[in-house]
């Protein structure tokens, strides 16, 4: 172990055990209470649109918070940002379990998302600090990624069981207690891993990726994929439990099948992307989104009200989601190695804002108890991405390939930001 990492003396297994609860709890904050969503408007005396906003704000703040907590963890250290984020998450979760005010509930969801974002940033920054340039980094990222991929499958099922036994408020108490345990372990065993103070964020760096067509292509690819899943889990409780009469437990199990399709696809993509190339895989993912949307539209037009008529096309959409999310990060970061941290934050922030705002707008304009929001979102975003892919392909057709040329152009522009 190198001297710069002398403070971290844990095995790989112990490291995963210490880090993973923060990532899991941050993700469970989005998925675990989905089975209770149809009943929450009555409990809080509000509208379904307000409850939808609690989903949107959490997702958007998770991404936007990285612009704040990433540089903050570089300046103050990983440990204080992690523990501060854990404290915010605990306070918000316990408040969510107690409040009966829709306005307070929404504010606490924003606080909970900020805490989750701080924990995510600190966790992945710690992995970079400890294992930078070492083979273990790929192992631990793979383990954490696999755990996070399973949350959409396990989270709603766990939430349904807690709701059935103790009520929906206990879901947030469960999250708060889990974060208390994780933070207590971190307070005792998690040393500071940042050994060198990093200069503050140069805000001009935030503009570097937005000038690059390749960055926008893959950021929109991410927004198309994750946004499709966001719209799905936003409308699925009302559609399946309300319109189709599925029980909470049945909903959670059916929801899990889509998440499982995504997990298996993501694992398969690790072999497909190097063989076929990012541009081809991107187009394949968008094609799956469009095909799934067309099948959903057919079931709606022909009034096929069966559960299978909704969930089977969603398996295809789920494959498209996993494909898009697998290919997007590396594609967006190509050409920005020297400012990868900043560009990563911009990527997740813009992606979260785009999918949250566009998805929420579509949900608000279309009937929530139908598949039309998923259909319109998938068709719109996937078509935009495919169109932008064609533009990028034309621009990069002079020899080296579409994205290599664009990446070189972006690298040249970033080397002289004052140009």
UniProtKB/Swiss-Prot annotation:
UniProt GO BP: response to antibiotic; xenobiotic detoxification by transmembrane export across the plasma membrane
Any GO MF annotation of the entry: xenobiotic transmembrane transporter activity
Designated name of the protein: Chloramphenicol resistance protein
Residues in the Cytoplasmic compartment per record: 31-46, 102-109, 163-169, 236-245, 300-306, 364-370
UniProt similarity note: Belongs to the major facilitator superfamily. Bcr/CmlA family.
InterPro entries associated with the record: Efflux_drug-R_Bcr/CmlA (IPR004812), MFS (IPR011701), MFS_dom (IPR020846), MFS_trans_sf (IPR036259)
Keyword match Cell inner membrane: yes
Organism of this sequence: Pseudomonas aeruginosa
Membrane topology classification: Multi-pass membrane protein
Main location as per UniProt: membrane
NCBIfam families, per the entry: cmlA_floR, efflux_Bcr_CflA, efflux_CmlA
Keywords noted in UniProt: Antibiotic resistance, Cell inner membrane, Cell membrane, Membrane, Plasmid, Transmembrane, Transmembrane helix, Transport, Transposable element
Ranges annotated as spanning the membrane: 10-30, 47-67, 81-101, 110-127, 142-162, 170-187, 215-235, 246-266, 280-299, 307-327, 343-363, 371-391
Localization per Swiss-Prot or TrEMBL: Cell inner membrane
CDD domains, per the entry: MFS_MdfA_MDR_like
Function, as annotated: Appears to provoke a reduction of the content of the major porins OmpA and OmpC.
GO cellular component assignments: plasma membrane
Gene name of the encoded protein: cmlA
Extracellular side: 1-9, 68-80, 128-141, 188-214, 267-279, 328-342, 392-419
Keyword presence, Amino-acid biosynthesis: no
